[in-house]
């Protein structure tokens, strides 16, 4: 959070969930920002109008924490939706588990169908951490299964936040940030295209690869792109449709959103921002610097194991980290690269 940013925490009820609304300074002209459009067949009744007014006033006055109490089914989510519409600020909703987060996401999606309501939770369906048994020199690889749909929604949430729009609600769980890279590196790898602009096709393809999109001219899946002459189809990692960019020499001739099955054009754009295919982004310079630091620490740790009379651990560590560094050199990333976060962005 940036220095000087204040917020308000609103608890729905005990052990339910809480909402954090960033209290950003209001613009001089409120019309300059995107508006939240609350859609509901219901109207505030009973104690709801008073609760909405008090919570809204508290946020505007910079009250750090407010609590909303209510029994199950009393309309707490609807009350908070009205507060969000009144404040008209980007909102982060935190839940203590993925099940409740999914429920809240569905409800807020219904209240704000014309705004960017996004879902950001852990994308693992299954996760087994790596392990090593020195007695038998057995290494058990980390095993996991990533939910592609949740991965898409996570990328969509990140893209919405970086798009500049203000009408964004992100529903998340408290353990959601595992595996995230540096937001600045993610933003620096956003590709902006504009119709009629000079842009070498080959340079554009290299930018796609740098943003971790993979070329696949046969079986196009999310996070892939294909090339047919001057036409480049990109299956955006955070969307359900293709982005088709047609070049005319070194100029962008057209930008279209295309149905991946029928090939029918859904929309045309004058300009478009393509966000990276992976949340863990970094630069080549940062990767080379990180590899150098990893090598130094690897040498020290291997030496320590050997001095302690633990050759099996030394050998296993040498093999594993060396393999990871080779993958970083060749591909720019490796499986479990988040474990090396402290080398890329100085995490403790």
Across the structure, where does each feature detected by a protein language model lie?
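Intrinsic-disorder-associated, low-complexity terminal segments enriched in Asp/Asn/His/Tyr and depleted
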Residues: 13, 28-29
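Residues marking helix boundaries in flexible regions
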Residues: 20-22, 30, 53
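Cationic, low-complexity basic patches in intrinsically disordered or flexible, solvent-exposed regions
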Residues: 3
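Exposed substrate/partner-binding surface patches
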Residues: 9
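ASCE RecA-like P-loop NTPase motor cores
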Residues: 32-348
């Amino acid at each position: 959070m940036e220095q000087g940013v204040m917020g308000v925490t609103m608890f729905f009820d005990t052990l339910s969930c809480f909402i954090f609304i960033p209290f950003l300074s209001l613009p001089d002209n409120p019309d300059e920002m995107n508006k939240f459009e609350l859609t509901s067949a219901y109207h505030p009744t009973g104690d709801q109008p008073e609760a909405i007014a008090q919570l809204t006033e508290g946020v505007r006055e910079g009250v750090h924490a407010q609590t909303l109490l209510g029994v199950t089914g009393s309309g707490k989510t609807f009350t908070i939706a009205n507060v969000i519409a009144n404040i008209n600020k980007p909102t982060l909703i935190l839940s203590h588990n993925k099940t409740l987060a999914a429920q809240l996401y569905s409800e807020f999606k219904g209240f704000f169908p014309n705004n960017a309501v996004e879902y950001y939770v852990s994308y693992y369906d299954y996760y087994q951490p790596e392990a090593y048994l020195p007695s038998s020199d057995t290494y058990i690889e980390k095993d996991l299964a990533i939910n592609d749909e949740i991965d898409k929604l996570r990328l969509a949430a990140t893209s919405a936040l970086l798009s500049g729009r203000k009408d964004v609600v992100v529903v998340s769980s408290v353990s959601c940030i595992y595996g995230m890279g540096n937001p600045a590196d993610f933003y620096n790898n956003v590709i902006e295209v504009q119709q009629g602009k000079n842009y070498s096709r080959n340079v554009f393809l290299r930018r796609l690869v740098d943003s971790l999109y993979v070329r696949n001219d046969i079986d196009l899946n999310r996070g892939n792109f294909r090339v047919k002459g001057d036409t480049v189809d990109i299956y955006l990692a955070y969307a359900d449709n293709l982005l088709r960019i047609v070049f005319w020499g070194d100029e962008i001739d057209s930008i279209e959103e295309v149905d991946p099955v029928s090939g029918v054009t859904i929309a045309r754009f004058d300009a478009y921002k393509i966000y990276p295919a992976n949340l863990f982004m970094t630069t080549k310079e940062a990767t080379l610097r990180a590899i150098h630091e990893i090598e130094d620490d690897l040498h020290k740790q291997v030496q320590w194991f050997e001095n302690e009379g633990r050759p099996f651990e030394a050998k296993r560590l040498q093999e594993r980290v060396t393999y990871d560094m080779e993958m970083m050199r060749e591909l720019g990333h490796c499986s479990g690269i988040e474990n090396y976060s402290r080398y890329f962005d100085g995490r403790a």
